[in-house]
């Protein structure tokens, strides 16, 4: 069975665990509709992405 040669310091343990935290997703307000959407994603309500119509507009 493998055994560590040295004890892991609290600093090194913390640096290893620093990437484990969950991050809250970021949202940007759409300029045209005012809806919140993810950056670099299309707006599903209007179907627009970077000023172009990508998909048909969703009718409510």
Swiss-Prot record:
GO terms for cellular component: large ribosomal subunit. One of its GO terms (molecular function) is structural constituent of ribosome. Residues 1-16 have a biased composition (Basic residues). Residues 17-44 have a biased composition (Basic and acidic residues). GO terms for biological process: translation. Residues 1-60 are annotated as: Disordered. Coiled coil: none annotated. The keyword Transport does not apply. Keywords: Ribonucleoprotein, Ribosomal protein. InterPro entries: Ribosomal_bL32 (IPR002677), Ribosomal_bL32_bact (IPR044957), Ribosomal_zn-bd (IPR011332). Belongs to the bacterial ribosomal protein bL32 family. This is Large ribosomal subunit protein bL32. It comes from Rhodopseudomonas palustris (strain HaA2). The gene is rpmF.
